[in-house]
Amino acid sequence: MPAPTNTLLIEGTFTELADEFAQYIDALRKNEGSSLQSEISSLLEPLRQQEQSEEEPDRKQRDEVLKKLVAAAAVLNAAPEKEIISAYNLLVHLVHQASNPDMFLSRICTYLAKPITTSPQFGPTLAISILTTIFNTLTSSDSSRYHVLLAIVAVIRQSGSSYAFEALKPQLTAQLPTWLAAWELDEEEAQKLHLAVADAAQASGDFELAQSHVVQALQTIPANESSSKEARDLAVRALASALKSPAVFDFTSLTAADAIQALRTSDSSLFELLEIFTADTLDAYEDFVAATPLASISGGVLADAGEALQNKLRLLTLASIAASAPSRSLPYATIASALRVPTEDVEKWVIDTIRAGLVEGKLSQLRSEFLVHRATYRVFGEKQWAEVQGRLMVWRRSLENVLGVVRAERERFIRESLQAATEEANQGKSGEKGGKGGDRRRNPQHQQQQQQSQPSQPQQPRETELVAGAE
């Protein structure tokens, strides 16, 4: 798969390699028709003289030689399997010496996009290997890479190899936007590439990526061409695949496209169905289908999708009622009624909706209810803003009540603390005064005896024995 830029190292002058390549082509042709080597011999002679005299080569003369070599190179797809890669690498090396390699590389890519007849089993792998080499010999901003990438995608689509597509997928995800900007493609070229990637992704079973690139292709259509037949066909394809896809629940990118809006006139029934999936519920869908059979919509693009559409709208309906539930609690009976399913199947549909990422919550079998933690709004207009405002007002009143309770408790705590401290201080002062007065009343004679019993002579100091520490 495409990687950092590489360089082909092939020894020999242009004239030597061109003559060698012409001989190889003649050998593959098995002498059918004129000899390619003889056709280019007269063109190579002046170039050979320039090489010998070390003069600047005449690139226009080289271009004339390359025109004949590239025109005859279609036969390389019939070369022996072990020689195909080296033969194409030699041709690519010669083409890089042209005045404008792009005019030759695009044709080489068309050859490689066709089957390699001598290797039905490994032909796609060989072609992808050669194309990858070509891609990596070009600078990142070289628009020739566009044709090479188209050929790589075409080979992968024809082979149906999911392994090859998975190898290319990281490059498409990480690098494709940068490549498109560097190559400065026009709307038509960008659309062609996105559709090619979508076809390859679908052939490999990656329907989500396929849908993404179909939408990107749709967005390349200019507003003044949104009503053309080509735009209408692409819009119908994008919308039908989005409606049928089990992974697409957000239709914002589709409704924003001018070509989709143009379906309001050209395919009004299909556009009405889009509006139901965007904002309405299962009730509206069933009323619509009763009046407008799916087989009659836009040439029957949804004729075989009745069950898939109904199941998908059940998930969307559950998301809607979960988002609008004022108490965030949905009884099983309410869900069963909205989804037109038995009560015993409610948990299955809730789990499917959670897996789709439309809601989050907890099932309570004891209470037979679904506790909604989060729900996706399918549309967000005045009604939804009003719901948000109402919930914010409820939360505000609840917080104000909590704040009032906290403030009252804080004031009560401070008041009681001050009161307790004051009482404790008063009790301490009263106890201290009472204790001192009682002592004086109880022991006046004892105090007098203590004063009289004190010796009149001063006391002699006591001898103190000093103990020396061991040395």
Curated annotation (Swiss-Prot):
Any one GO biological process: formation of cytoplasmic translation initiation complex
Summary of the function given for this chain in its UniProt record: Component of the eukaryotic translation initiation factor 3 (eIF-3) complex, which is involved in protein synthesis of a specialized repertoire of mRNAs and, together with other initiation factors, stimulates binding of mRNA and methionyl-tRNAi to the 40S ribosome. The eIF-3 complex specifically targets and initiates translation of a subset of mRNAs involved in cell proliferation.
GO function terms (MF aspect): translation initiation factor activity
Record's compositionally biased regions (Basic and acidic residues): 430-442
PROSITE patterns attached to this UniProt entry: PCI
Disordered, as annotated region: 39-61, 419-471
Principal cellular location given in the protein's record: cytoplasm
Residue spans of biased composition, Low complexity class: 445-461
Coiled-coil regions, chain positions: none
GO cellular component term of the entry, any: eukaryotic 48S preinitiation complex
Entry keyword Cytoplasm: yes
Keyword Cytoplasm among UniProt keywords: yes
SUPFAM superfamilies for this protein: ARM repeat
Quaternary data: Component of the eukaryotic translation initiation factor 3 (eIF-3) complex.
HAMAP family on file: eIF3m (MF_03012)
Name by which UniProt lists this protein: Eukaryotic translation initiation factor 3 subunit M
Compartment annotation: Cytoplasm
Location of the PCI domain: 206-377
Family, similarity comment: Belongs to the eIF-3 subunit M family.
